[in-house]
Amino acid sequence: MAAPLKAVDGNADRTGDLQALMSDLAARARAAARVLALAPPEQKNRALEAMERAIRSNAAAILAANAEDVAEARASSNMTASFIDRLTLTPARVESMAEGIGIVRGIADPVGIVTESWQRPNGMTIERVRVPLGVVGVIFESRPNVAADAGVLCLKSGNAVILRGGSDSFRSCRAIHECLVQGLREAGLPEAAITLVPTRDRAAVGMMLSGLNGAIDVIVPRGGKSLVARVEQEARVPVFAHLEGVNHVYVDASADLAMAKSIVLNAKMRRTGVCGAAETLLVDRAAAATSLKPLVEMLIEAGCEVRGDDVVQKTDARVKPANDDDWDTEYLDAIIAAKVVDGVDGAIAHIQNHGSHHTDAIVSENEAAAKKFLSEVDSAIVLHNASTQFADGGEFGFGAEIGIATGRFHARGPVGAEQLTSFKYRVHGTGQTRP
């Protein structure tokens, strides 16, 4: 067994020490990726089963580590309630983490699947086969559960992963990572298959973005706008961009009001700090007289601040005026911007101008309007008569997700095990030569 990685402390030759540390862990991860690429599904599933057990049996230690992280965050005056919510683990959330590992274990192994096969006129058979990406670098901020989600999804898809969690969740991630390593060890897989960067030093992020001399094949950022922007600007390897969720719910004139109220309330208030939370409510002008006031009152009475245009402000004195920035803001809090638009075309135009290509929903009983919305809104996830909070890999049946990719290349939407694979072509011949 290789010696454990040593954390970088102090200031003496810090950059040199950190570079050596990162180069070492990258080399170990690359070696582990070669082993994982050939690991049979049964061995990977044994590791996942052991990880699930370890999370449950070490729940108290995970929660204790998280309590220290949360206490430190609360002592900082600039941490919002939504940030604290994303950072906080509860017994139910730890159990959900374990259950997610079990679900990932139960899904089909994507590696080695022949997605397409055909025979050429010369008798050669060509197969397109799923293969792992290699080494995935995951850079995330406050959510400690990302360590588990990313670790198990990369394992399932035959990839090694280097995890760099936020400094705010450092202790929590370390406790979770120990459980994942225990599972790898019990299954006889290399411990470097899931590596946690053992330092809070922010310079480690820049080193990962450099690709660590070709050791990292793809970067997945999970965090706020500034993190994602930095990754996209500095990364020298491909990026699965997880942009902010400026998500919209459009209530069409044909919408059932009871359904609309239920969807809007859930989309905004179920958990305000998740990337699938609705941030803007759009209401068809033709429904304003009947639907707007009930929707606004419902949100305010649920504890949500509503910032509206002139029409919305007239429905309730408690509505605050919206400014131009509100239409582009991911609040991650109990705040929503609200606007009246001219039908589905007006909603689509607003989303095109202000959306983040993440998740947008229409509430409508008009199939033509719904079809138009689903076709023309250029977001990774578009929903008809359902809450935006279904923007989640677990809800898609992926077991978990490594992020919601909002770009257009390779992966889009929830990134599960299958999306963490590429492909190669296998060609079978009987001695053919090209004329």
Swiss-Prot record:
Keyword Cytoplasm in record: yes
The EC number(s) this enzyme carries: 1.2.1.41
UniProtKB keywords: Amino-acid biosynthesis, Cytoplasm, NADP, Oxidoreductase, Proline biosynthesis
Subcellular localization: Cytoplasm
Recorded superkingdom: Bacteria
Enzyme class: oxidoreductase
Biochemical pathway: Amino-acid biosynthesis; L-proline biosynthesis; L-glutamate 5-semialdehyde from L-glutamate: step 2/2
GO terms, biological process: L-proline biosynthetic process
GO cellular component entries: cytoplasm
Catalytic activity reported: L-glutamate 5-semialdehyde + phosphate + NADP(+) = L-glutamyl 5-phosphate + NADPH + H(+)
MF terms (GO), sorted A to Z: glutamate-5-semialdehyde dehydrogenase activity; NADP binding
UniProt-listed Pfam families: Aldedh
Known role: Catalyzes the NADPH-dependent reduction of L-glutamate 5-phosphate into L-glutamate 5-semialdehyde and phosphate. The product spontaneously undergoes cyclization to form 1-pyrroline-5-carboxylate.
PANTHER family: DELTA-1-PYRROLINE-5-CARBOXYLATE SYNTHASE, GLUTAMATE SEMIALDEHYDE DEHYDROGENASE
Family statement: Belongs to the gamma-glutamyl phosphate reductase family.
UniProt name for this protein: Gamma-glutamyl phosphate reductase
